């Protein structure tokens, strides 16, 4: 039944189906969901079993065992822990290991390893690799910025321009299922490989893939930036037991200032004024006032001191 919201005209189409065809349709519909639920059930069981058998992969250094215990109890009590220690003492493995342990008993749904640099993302990947070598079954994805993973030289998401955007949603489910059932380590190269295979947008596919992964390695922005954060996890209605391992957290202060700060450029006001001066004199006058005010601020900043 369709209703025209303007005229309130109602048009109905009536169809008759026998019970056999309805049952067949329903079973096909459920079968489409069943393979995903089977994946979640089987993967979670295998992951939890591997975690229960997992041991710390090195001999504990001085203070390291205490650090591991502190991280685990912090996760369990849903509190915040700030760790300051010299480079090379094993902070990464000492935080990732207890976070992984918390996944097997329902404390944690997903681990976010947040970084400010590409090189530290590599450290996180290597740490997970060490745990996999020790027997861990744990799927991770490393998220890459859209402009760094796009197949086009200049990304354009218009389906008429990008062949990977054209028909993306018709193919992405199969692409995601393919990659998560065949790869445990999903990074930029893996995403690009499967996006070419299935002709889907690599960036959007990586976000969909993250839903089915145990660990997500990504930039601070994906968690904290109000414009770039992953709405599927942190938007309205997004809810889950997540652990955040914030690498080099002291860098987050400056990044947060940038995320929550806006910038106005004086030259932009001048350009806009010149564009509209022959069309809307009132608007041009307002833009000129803004330009003059910002010029006065600029001159003020040029002074060595202000009284």
Which residue ranges define each predicted feature?
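Nucleic-acid nuclease catalytic cores
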Residues: 1-23
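Polybasic (Lys/Arg-rich)
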Residues: 18-52
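Conserved pre-motif I regulatory segment
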Residues: 41-84
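A substrate-engagement module of RecA-like helicase motors
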Residues: 47-49, 54, 107-216, 221-224, ...
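Walker A/P-loop NTP-binding motif
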Residues: 72-73, 92-107, 127-131
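Walker A/P-loop
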Residues: 76-98, 110
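Generic beta-sheet signal
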Residues: 79-83, 109-111, 215-218, 242-244
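Signature of the SF2 helicase/ATPase Hel1-core->accessory helical subdomain module
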Residues: 95, 101, 122, 126, ...
């Amino acid at each position: 039944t369709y209703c025209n919201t303007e005229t309130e005209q109602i048009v109905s189409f009536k169809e008759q189906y026998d019970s056999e065809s309805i049952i067949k349709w329903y079973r096909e519909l459920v079968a489409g969901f069943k393979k995903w639920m089977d994946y979640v059930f089987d993967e979670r069981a295998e992951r939890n079993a591997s975690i229960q058998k997992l041991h710390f992969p090195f001999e504990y250094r001085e203070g390291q065992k205490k650090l591991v215990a502190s991280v685990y109890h912090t996760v369990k009590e849903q509190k915040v822990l700030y760790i300051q220690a010299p480079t090379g003492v094993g902070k990464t493995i000492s935080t990732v290991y207890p976070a992984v342990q918390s996944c097997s008993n329902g404390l944690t749904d997903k681990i976010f390893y947040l970084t400010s640099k590409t090189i530290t993302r590599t450290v996180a990947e290597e740490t997970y690799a060490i745990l996999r070598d020790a027997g861990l079954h744990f799927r991770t994805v490393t998220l890459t910025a859209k402009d760094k993973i796009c197949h086009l030289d200049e990304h354009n998401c218009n389906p008429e321009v990008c062949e990977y955007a054209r028909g993306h949603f018709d193919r992405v489910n199969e692409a995601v299922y393919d990659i998560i059932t065949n790869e445990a380590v999903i990074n930029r190269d893996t995403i690009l490989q499967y996006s070419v295979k299935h002709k889907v947008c690599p960036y959007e596919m990586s976000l969909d893939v993250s839903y089915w992964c145990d660990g997500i390695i990504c930039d601070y922005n994906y968690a904290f930036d109000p414009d770039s954060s992953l709405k599927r996890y942190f938007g309205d209605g997004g809810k889950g037991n997540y652990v955040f391992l914030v690498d080099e957290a002291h860098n987050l202060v400056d990044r947060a200032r940038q995320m929550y700060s806006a910038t106005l450029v004086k030259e932009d006001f001048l350009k806009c004024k010149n564009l509209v001066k022959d069309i809307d004199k009132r608007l041009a006058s307002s833009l000129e006032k803004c330009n003059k005010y910002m010029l006065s601020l600029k001159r003020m900043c040029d002074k060595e001191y202000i009284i």
